[in-house]
């Protein structure tokens, strides 16, 4: 009897151990098979009350509801906050107008409900500084909100950063009418937010709208979270010169040589690309220490309105690895995954996964040469650009052109996979033979199985 009880007890223990093991969830993996850190699953908001003393700007001489440009007064509040050990600079209900502001280590920005930090519509109010633009380190105009070397920097809402871009957009399109070859940089415009050389950055529950140029730009940052943000710029009717035109180059989030970035629960509608991976451009870009790769980028549970590309790699990019776009809804996007291939830049896009998307778009996958403002130089050892290990799976969408891909002697495409896809496709251009070692499994286009 005792023996039977012992055996039963041992069997029960074995069952409990086995059941316990079954309950342990296997870690999620990046496309290259390495584990995704638990950090990427944590969308807990920063508790602003833990960030230090509140510095409500109107308590320090800043006028509310005033059209006066108060850059000097607002910067004085930021500087005082830093000098007194750090804290949170608060924009209360109402609005204040400013040029370029520079946050210091230990300072943070909160914009309260119905509060607005509004950018000046005069470029003279934005400082010329050494900064980063279009894959280059150069002198250009600072953003409205700037933070360099600010580990732990936090921007939180629910109020608004309003770039007030109307005058800049109109000037841009007038300039283009006068000189159709004018560059983006020649039309002098500030960005809304520029954060550089910073770790553990959080931008949460804030409206960031109407940027004159790129909306958010992060350079050489690590562990960045964009959580629940509303990012918007108009896509048409910004100028009587040409009512079809929208807010030019108003990219939602530009990640420039950044690692470990989560964009979660955000809404993006801009007149350019949404989430963009950058890192350098030019024939020698891979040799420049100011440039760098984008790695471990997760875009999850977002909603896209009209954008040029939901997830765009390039064009100013040298190496992007372990990039995931998942569980998003798309409405009226021009492209979903856009791999821009610059003939003048050595580029390597690898281990990218797009999955669990619904909605509608013009083109889903685009891989084409990109030659806007490019300057090829002679280089004997110029590497051949390549795209490899690109996975697209679990997609249900209506497309005008699901597969917008072209071959070139300037780049190589290999090891793509398409799995569990059900789409409508007016163009009907799906041709996996254009890609080396392309795997197709359970792909249905216009009701016709393709594998």
Regions found by a protein language model. Name each.
Residues 86, 99-100, 120-122, 164-168, ...:
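Short glycine/acidic-rich loop motifs that flank beta-strands on beta-rich extracellular proteins
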Residues 336-337, 343-402, 423:
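C-terminal structural cap/anchor segments
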Residues 95, 220-222, 279-281, 315-317, ...:
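Active-site-proximal loop/turn and secondary-structure-junction residues that shape catalytic pockets
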Residues 113-114, 151-160, 199-210, 222-236, ...:
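Right-handed parallel beta-helix
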Residues 370, 407-408, 432-435:
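A structural signal for leucine-rich repeat
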Residues 122, 130-132, 202, 339, ...:
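Mature catalytic domains of secreted/periplasmic carbohydrate-active enzymes
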Residues 2-7, 19-90, 95-108, 112-197, ...:
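Extracellular "leader-to-stem" segments immediately downstream of a signal peptide or signal-anchor
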Residues 11-19:
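Hydrophobic h-region of N-terminal signal peptides that target proteins for export
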